[in-house]
């Protein structure tokens, strides 16, 4: 009964109409009703013989509003009525959403029945907490992945980027984190994924164990740009709800690049000028607004701090170019980056992380002194081997010429084995440092 009363109270007695004036490509031009329309407003467009088409106001041109639809425009004709959605873009999540798969509109797509709706609406687009009103990063987080636990030790509330080309194991790494990281809830956003890979990721890669404490938000590559962008906002909105329930949240998004591509498509359709590699100015405006929503929780009025949102965002580097515009912009916003390389994947070592190029900006503050010594020693050994690798492979290096290189050659097989990890295997933080410490103290 309470939910029914709340639904009735949300009904806006004032309904504003406009009418479709023209349809040009991705845009629908509307006349009338402009006194209540603003950029970002949600509307519904009547279609002949079909359900109303949801759309969003993306701009204005003289006396007409420019709408972009969330679906195909078939059935939309001149004079079709436009109705403003008074509540705007909100979602009403509950903790019962854990274990469910939803689309960008918060609707279930897993065939398990309707989702219960919460009483509190969460706007899909909210500003990040002010810098002076949010806590600091917390204690370190056990991710269950040896290479990340040691070389990119992560604190609760930290935001990391996973930078990789296509087909090097990003999705498998995300599934390992979703299953093994020590947190209360996981929110996974699959933005612009291939349709056939979604079920494979959920059933095989993530599995029943990983899904049990997760909410998965899906927008496939064939869906409109607005829908793909909204899926990213939905992922953060659900993460913020879980945070407000005092749940320590791990937010995983694959990928930020496809969010940026969706925003570029929207901007170009609205008439924005293209800049670097065709990306519009709003892409670089929206990126920090999205990424900064994750992190340490805001400070409450009573002085306590809300639970953190630890986030890992994948960045699909174009042509394995780690300095392309989105990768470069994202790297400057986040608190660290994990670099995955195709060459490492091609030689069969997974996760294919190049630990020498990966950085966590909360290190070394979240490591004990003896752990810092282990990481420093391992980096020195791996760097020495990397610098001489070509000479070693062609047989040009003579044993005994450099004791440091000789030791690196002896230890390299064991270090490579340490960095390699099966997707069903988990290793704790303490065990990760202990294993690497034993390798450095031994001789092979």
From Swiss-Prot:
Keywords on record: ATP synthesis, ATP-binding, Bacterial flagellum biogenesis, Bacterial flagellum protein export, Cytoplasm, Hydrogen ion transport, Ion transport, Nucleotide-binding, Protein transport, Translocase, Transport
GO MF terms, alphabetically ordered: ATP binding; ATP hydrolysis activity; proton-transporting ATP synthase activity, rotational mechanism
Keyword Cytoplasm (UniProt): yes
Location in or out of the cell: Cytoplasm
One of the protein's GO biological processes: bacterial-type flagellum organization
Chief subcellular location: cytoplasm
Sections of the chain in a coiled coil: none
Catalysis: reaction(s): ATP + H2O + 4 H(+)(in) = ADP + phosphate + 5 H(+)(out)
Family annotation (InterPro entries): AAA+_ATPase, ATPase_a/bsu_AS, ATPase_alpha/beta_chains, ATPase_F1/V1/A1_a/bsu_N, ATPase_F1/V1/A1_a/bsu_nucl-bd, ATPase_T3SS_FliI/YscN, FliI_clade3, P-loop_NTPase
Pfam annotation, one family: T3SS_ATPase_C
Cellular component, GO annotation: bacterial-type flagellum; cytoplasm; type III protein secretion system complex
Domain of life from the UniProt record: Bacteria
Top-level enzyme category: translocase
Family statement drawn from the similarity comment of this UniProt entry: Belongs to the ATPase alpha/beta chains family.
Family annotation (NCBIfam families): FliI_clade3, fliI_yscN
Protein name (Swiss-Prot/TrEMBL): Flagellum-specific ATP synthase
């Amino acid at each position: 009964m309470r939910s029914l009363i709340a639904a009735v109270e949300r009904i806006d007695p004032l309904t504003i109409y406009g009418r479709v004036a023209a349809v040009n490509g991705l845009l629908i031009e509307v006349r009338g009703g402009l006194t209540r329309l603003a950029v970002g407003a949600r509307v519904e467009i009547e279609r002949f013989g079909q359900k109303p088409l949801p759309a969003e106001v993306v701009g204005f041109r003289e006396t007409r509003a420019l709408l972009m639809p969330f679906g195909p425009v078939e059935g939309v004709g001149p004079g079709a009525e436009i109705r403003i959605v008074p509540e705007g873009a909100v979602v009403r999540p509950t903790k019962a959403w854990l274990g469910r798969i939803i689309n960008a509109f918060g609707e279930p797509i897993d065939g398990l029945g309707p989702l219960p709706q919460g009483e509190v609406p969460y706007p899909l687009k909210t500003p990040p907490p002010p810098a002076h009103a949010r806590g600091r990063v917390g204690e370190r987080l056990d991710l269950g992945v040896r290479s990340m636990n040691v070389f990119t030790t992560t604190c609760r509330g930290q935001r990391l980027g996973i930078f990789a080309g296509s087909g090097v194991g990003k999705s498998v790494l995300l599934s390992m984190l979703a299953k093994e990281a020590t947190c209360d809830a996981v929110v996974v956003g699959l933005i612009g994924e291939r349709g056939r890979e979604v079920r494979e990721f959920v059933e095989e890669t993530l599995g029943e164990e990983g899904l049990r404490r997760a909410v998965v938000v899906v927008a496939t590559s064939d869906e409109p740009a607005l829908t793909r962008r909204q899926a990213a906002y939905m992922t953060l909105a659900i993460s913020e709800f879980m945070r407000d329930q005092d749940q320590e949240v791990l937010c995983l998004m694959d990928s930020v690049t496809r969010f940026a591509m969706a925003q570029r498509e929207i901007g170009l359709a609205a008439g924005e000028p293209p800049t670097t590699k065709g990306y519009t100015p709003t892409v670089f405006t929206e990126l920090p607004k999205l990424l900064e929503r994750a992190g340490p929780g805001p400070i409450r009025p009573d002085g306590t701090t809300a639970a953190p949102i630890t986030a890992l965002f994948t960045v699909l580097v174009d042509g394995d170019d780690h300095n392309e515009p989105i990768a470069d912009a994202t790297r400057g916003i986040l608190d660290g980056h994990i670099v995955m390389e195709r060459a490492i994947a091609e030689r069969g070592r997974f996760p294919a992380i190049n630990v020498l190029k990966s950085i966590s900006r909360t290190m070394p503050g979240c490591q004990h002194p003896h752990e810092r010594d282990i990481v420093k020693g391992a980096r020195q050994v791996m760097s020495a081997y990397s610098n001489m690798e070509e000479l070693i492979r062609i047989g040009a290096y003579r044993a005994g010429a450099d004791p440091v290189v000789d030791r690196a050659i002896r230890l390299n097989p064991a270090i490579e084995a340490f960095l390699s990890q099966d997707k069903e295997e988990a290793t704790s933080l303490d065990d990760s440092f202990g294993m690497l410490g034993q390798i450095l103290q031994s001789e092979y």
